[in-house]
Amino acid sequence: MIKLIVNADDFGLTEGTNYGIIDGHINGLVNSTTMMMNMPGTEHAVRLAKEHNTLGVGVHLVLTAGKPLLGDVPSLVSSDGLFHKQSVVWEGKINPEEVEREWTAQIEKFLSYGLTPTHLDSHHHVHGLPILHDVLEKLAATYNVPIRRCEEERAVRPFSDVFYSDFYADGVTEDYFVKLKERVQGEQTVEIMVHPAYIDPELVKRSSYVMDRVKELRILTESELPEGIELVKF
């Protein structure tokens, strides 16, 4: 039996995103999500998470969008006080100690709402940066949580055997989940990253990935898993 986690990234980005994720959970295949702690929809996401406790919720660690929670992390921000663009972060010119403090603050904010994180992942997969491996090891040990497997680098305390990020843009196809059995060996645990949402003005303002989120939501709520695949949580 293939064990499947369908994790919706960007919980907390906007209210429309939050409602899309919840709809994808109640009426579709989404059984896990990760929350951004520095976005306009964070408080709204917290309320929804508490109302829908069958949805596993982890922390979507942020380093490339919005403003940091801490004010004393100079290597992480541009002159405007916002996080660097992802191209800058991927150059590796950031201070891992500052990343550790900022990500700890994000996790602690999540905990302050009385929520228990199922796992950690990151916006734009920045936790795959080699210079952050030690930070991840420490966070995983401190909070006793697994971390999303990265395609790019060695995995740090992974939960799944396989991670797919290709249900995205042109990869959002009607038969994606039907064909999953052809790609996965039996008994493996698989995580698929998804981004369902309803469009609202804040999403258009903050993301270049917009229309396909609605398509994702439709497919996630219309698809059925083939025999031999079961949904599990972190």
Swiss-Prot record:
The superkingdom listed in its UniProt entry is: Bacteria
* GO term, biological process aspect, one: polysaccharide catabolic process
* EC nos: 3.5.1.-
Q: Where does Mg(2+) bind?
A: 60, 123
Name the Pfam families for this protein: YdjC (PF04794)
Identify which cofactors the protein needs according to its UniProt entry. Mg(2+)
The record's family statement is: Belongs to the YdjC deacetylase family.
Output this protein's name: Carbohydrate deacetylase
Which organism encodes this protein?
Bacillus cereus (strain ATCC 10987 / NRS 248)
Could you read off the lineage of the organism from its UniProt record?
A: Bacteria, Bacillati, Bacillota, Bacilli, Bacillales
